[in-house]
UniProtKB/Swiss-Prot annotation:
HAMAP family, A to Z: Ribosomal_uL22_B (MF_01331_B)
GO molecular function per UniProt: rRNA binding; structural constituent of ribosome
NCBIfam families per the UniProt record, alphabetical: rplV_bact
Name of the molecule in the record: Large ribosomal subunit protein uL22
Pfam families for this protein: Ribosomal_L22
GO CC field: cytosolic large ribosomal subunit
Function: This protein binds specifically to 23S rRNA; its binding is stimulated by other ribosomal proteins, e.g. L4, L17, and L20. It is important during the early stages of 50S assembly. It makes multiple contacts with different domains of the 23S rRNA in the assembled 50S subunit and ribosome.
Entry similarity comment: Belongs to the universal ribosomal protein uL22 family.
Keywords annotated in UniProt: Ribonucleoprotein, Ribosomal protein, RNA-binding, rRNA-binding
Annotated source species: Bradyrhizobium diazoefficiens (strain JCM 10833 / BCRC 13528 / IAM 13628 / NBRC 14792 / USDA 110)
Amino acid sequence: MSKPKRERSLAENEAKAVARMLRVSPQKLNLVAQLIRGRKAAAALADLQFSRKRIAVDVKKCLESAIANAENNHDLDVDDLVVAQAFVGNGLVMKRFAARGRGRSGRVYKPFSQLTIIVRQVEAEAAAA
């Protein structure tokens, strides 16, 4: 007695990977996500490899996971993959105490983010354009 299978929310030529609890603000993560939106998967990996942003390592891991999901779970051709969507969501925000002068206190916010990457297989001639 297992639950009935859900319908697939993505198209047949798409695969998805999600990275949760990334310890960075959504605003900073979105700067890196903008780099790879709409790019070929190989070019996006190269961009992330040489990015100077700290979070680019985690974005690269998530993109590699999406590529692996496309290849292994959905039988898509890795060479024709394009980053169709890369979007960022809010995670939880840890609030911490910071001692200030004269017996006062301040708040330190430690935000977390979520990253979703969807790769799509496109035709070879469309990917070259």
